[in-house]
């Protein structure tokens, strides 16, 4: 189960450490703490914003307090939705639910920005199109064509992993 919160990694560890059967912190610098409670595994990530250097797909991470800012950094609108708890209220600032209903694949921000920031998202787009039958928007297709050369900054292992998921 993936959760996002305005709590910092230190606050997450302090709150859940005493009740966790296991707790792992490999992703802590990106704001992610893993927790196992009983037979359930949770990844809890602090809301964040990211910025990228032009020659890297590794983000500079800044923790935030607003889930909407966190959703803006997601790869596609269908992944940029959240349920606000304890009352289940859908937070959908980029109309991901409508895109899901229309089988449409779109990025929350301009696709050129999204694919420049993280070129691996172009391969993820291919996987979502093939695996879920989503139809890409014309601007997404144009951005993939224009940014295909950016895949050179992605490690071969990451490309292989994404192609394995595609197949």
Which role does the model predict for each range below?
Residues 1-167:
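Catalytic cores of the polymerase beta-like nucleotidyltransferase superfamily
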């Amino acid at each position: 189960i993936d959760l996002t919160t305005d709590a910092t990694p230190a606050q997450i560890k302090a709150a859940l450490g005493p009740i966790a059967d296991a707790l792992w912190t490999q992703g802590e610098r990106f704001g992610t703490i893993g927790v196992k409670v009983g037979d359930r595994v949770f990844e809890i990530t602090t809301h964040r914003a990211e910025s990228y250097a032009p020659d890297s797909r590794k983000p500079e991470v800044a923790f935030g307090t607003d889930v909407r800012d966190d959703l803006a950094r997601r790869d596609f609108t269908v992944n940029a939705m959240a349920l606000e708890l304890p009352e289940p209220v859908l937070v959908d600032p980029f109309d991901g639910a409508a895109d899901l209903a229309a089988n449409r694949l779109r990025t929350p921000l301009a696709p050129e920005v999204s694919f420049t920031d993280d070129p691996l998202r172009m391969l993820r787009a291919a996987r979502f199109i093939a695996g879920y039958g989503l139809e890409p928007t014309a601007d997404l297709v144009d951005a993939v064509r224009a940014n295909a050369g950016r895949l050179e900054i992605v490690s071969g292992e990451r490309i292989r992993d994404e192609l394995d998921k595609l197949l």
